[in-house]
UniProtKB/Swiss-Prot annotation:
Species the sequence originates in: Papilio xuthus (Asian swallowtail butterfly)
Keyword Metal-binding applies: yes
Lineage per the UniProt record: Eukaryota, Metazoa, Ecdysozoa, Arthropoda, Hexapoda
UniProt record, GO biological process: intracellular iron ion homeostasis; iron ion transport
UniProt keyword list: Disulfide bond, Golgi apparatus, Iron, Iron storage, Metal-binding, Oxidoreductase, Secreted, Signal
Family according to the record: Belongs to the ferritin family.
Disulphide bonds in the chain: C41-C150
Protein name: Ferritin heavy chain
Signal sequence segment: 1-20
Location in or out of the cell: Golgi apparatus; Secreted
Annotated binding of Fe cation 1, by residue: E52, E87, H90
Domain (Ferritin-like diiron) ranges: 35-191
Length: 211
């Protein structure tokens, strides 16, 4: 208990209240020699974080679209809401990596700029799946551009980050693209055979139901 009180007292001692939610803490002088990420690589990583956040918001819009009472496709809604969470997790992983490398010492609010989703409605499940596939392809290209920027800098080839992005992100991207392409192909075949009923049946399949 005494340790907790001491910690609180120490925090109050260094915090000068500006408002009910803010305090000033004098910066400390820490050696910078361990911070080695180059500007081109750092900038690419920051842009990738925004790309992942944008993809997450787009998937949220897609999930909300298929949740509407007039559309009511819970399988598609779940697919896209899950994808939104996955993209948000990707952004968090990239932020964690920058923190580990000492690249986020000051205000980090510039990392996340909220922009309206590119689209807010889709004509069909096929339209949505093909849009998702196109979006994932663009995300993959963006990750590859980060890798190129981080491994081609003449001052510092960032092997560790390149290996992290290649193993942690690229493989998942390629598997995700293949999965979306397969889903779109299957749905088109079901529509050819069962007409509009095909999308209803496919939606149930997305929920794990037997059809």
């Amino acid at each position: 208990m005494k340790a907790v009180l001491f910690a609180v007292a120490a925090l109050l001692a260094v915090c000068i209240p500006i408002s009910a939610k803010q305090c000033n803490v004098n910066p400390v002088n820490i050696p910078k020699g361990w911070i080695t990420m180059q500007q081109s690589c750092r900038g690419s990583m920051r842009r990738q974080i925004q790309t992942e956040v944008g993809a997450s918001l787009q998937y949220l819009a897609m999930g909300a679209h298929f949740s509407r009472d007039g559309i009511n496709r819970p399988g598609f809604a779940k697919l896209f809401f899950d994808a939104a969470s996955e993209e948000r997790e990707h952004a968090m992983k990239l932020i964690d990596y920058l923190l580990m490398r000492g690249e986020l010492e000051t205000d980090v609010t510039s990392l996340i700029q909220i922009r309206a989703p590119e689209r807010k409605s889709w004509e069909s499940g096929v339209d949505a799946l093909e849009h998702a596939l196109k979006m994932e392809t663009e995300v993959t290209k963006s990750i590859r551009s980060v890798i190129i920027a981080c491994e081609s800098d003449p001052k510092f080839n960032d092997y560790h980050l390149v290996d992290y992005l290649t193993g942690e992100f690229l493989e998942e991207q390629y598997k995700g693209q293949r999965d979306l392409a397969g889903k779109a192909s299957t749905l088109k075949k079901m529509l050819d055979r069962h007409s509009s009923l095909g999308e209803f049946l496919f939606d149930k399949k997305l929920l794990g139901m037997d059809i």
